[in-house]
């Protein structure tokens, strides 16, 4: 049975990757269908009710700069906002928001329902239809066939998902949802390498049974940050506190006593878990010298009593979970409303993807999110946007696009995955980026919004706001560079009390701002120097561009050198055995990874600069030198 309409792009899955993919393709004008097993869970936050953080907040800002939904939904759902690393340099500052699960889901669903060119249909997908190495559609569990030119698969943890609590386990995509068994079996038939990963979640606690007076209160920031470049503090709902407590030796003894019934330590779970978000049993085992671990007590929303105890993800049996929770200060009488669990699921080796997130072996089939071995809403959303965008570009007969490592954290994410692959759930950190001084949260729109407009991702309202901001920044920078103060100026007596060293020679306003004791707002409040910019984001941009101009220029020069051969393309059908001078080890690695560019090849472990030189000579001799998009 065939559906009565044909689509340009079909997106399978309605999580963070799927929603961004569907919205991106539809914004670009492609007739798009989003298929989900349950309309009510579109935009569901399956684990931690929070968005952003170190590295992750950078991805959210980039999604937003390209017109995505995650940051906007967070502004409407965020019940506590904080800027992490606020005392450090701008490169590592990151916005994090605690979110109300219900409000976040509602906002995402509202955005989806009002998006032109997008249809939503409730059915689980059981089959991917491939003809002559090209995807042509999907078939749902009731046998309904949908045709499309491109398919974006965002199956999350649902592929052959298995939930573990103690030594008991059962099939599931997440708690309360069925797994995708038939689709997982079908995908294993495709020529793409497959593995198993594991992730977990903590038990949820009834807030009415917690003694918060025994814990440390953690309030949000004042003034309140916003997540979206289009956001405003007026969008935020009521703001509330989180709380901090700790495990103790009694907690650790309870956990050690239950390890014989842990699915992780009894060999029941085969999948590898996330290194940077370990279970509490993993923490006790790996950091046996520590007598306590911090736990963040995070409300799940304004209209629920459920609490997310961030830091005690576990798959131990329920009785052990209850005992360990009640051993923690402030939770002596706590009641669990949902048990913690681990989930194992299939993922596919991202080295089998192009940097457009299209599979190398099946034309028109794109993968995004946890199916590629990542962990986290933000990583999923970034991949979804990129995959949906490239699916739309392909349908339109246009070249694929992916930002380079020096252009966006999205570029770092995709390059790491498609070049190096991953054997454990991949999480973004600022430390993964070589050029993080240029890849800041604050300039994500300056880096990406113009490209997003060119691609058709950015609407008129965002473009108008961005253009106005850019113009105000440029005009203010020109003003600071062109206005000067002389030692005999009547402004000097007003200015000198604010300076460590008094004015002794002619100086521009820009030079004054560059002084370490001066900041933009302080300078603008001094008589004769203001009023300055009213927009705090534009003002912040002016300050950073002035104060860090030397560092930024040096990093840009490094990038210009590195980019010279970065985008030199390598044919996917190139047999490296035919390249004279390469060692057997290098040949094996290049034939296994099939890098798309010289830049990707250079980042594969064991590929030497000499091997790269040999490749460049070979390409030149064969007339194969080309630049990728």
From Swiss-Prot:
What does the UniProt record say this protein does? NAD-binding protein involved in the addition of a carboxymethylaminomethyl (cmnm) group at the wobble position (U34) of certain tRNAs, forming tRNA-cmnm(5)s(2)U34.
The entry's localization annotation reads: Cytoplasm
Q: Which family does it belong to?
A: Belongs to the MnmG family.
Coiled coil ranges:
none
Instruction: Provide the gene name from the record.
Output: mnmG
Under the subunit heading, UniProt states: Homodimer. Heterotetramer of two MnmE and two MnmG subunits.
Q: Which cofactor does it need?
A: FAD
Q: Name one GO molecular function term.
A: flavin adenine dinucleotide binding
Q: Which domain of life is it from?
A: Bacteria
- What is the protein named? tRNA uridine 5-carboxymethylaminomethyl modification enzyme MnmG
Question: What PROSITE patterns does the record tag this protein with?
Answer: GIDA_1, GIDA_2
Q: For FAD, which residues are the binding ones?
A: 13-18, 125, 180, 370
Where, by residue number, does NAD(+) bind? Answer: 273-287
What processes in GO biological process is this protein linked to? Answer: tRNA methylation; tRNA wobble uridine modification
Q: What is the lineage of its organism?
A: Bacteria, Pseudomonadati, Pseudomonadota, Gammaproteobacteria, Alteromonadales
Q: Name one GO cellular component term.
A: cytosol
Which UniProt keyword terms apply here?
A: Cytoplasm, FAD, Flavoprotein, NAD, tRNA processing
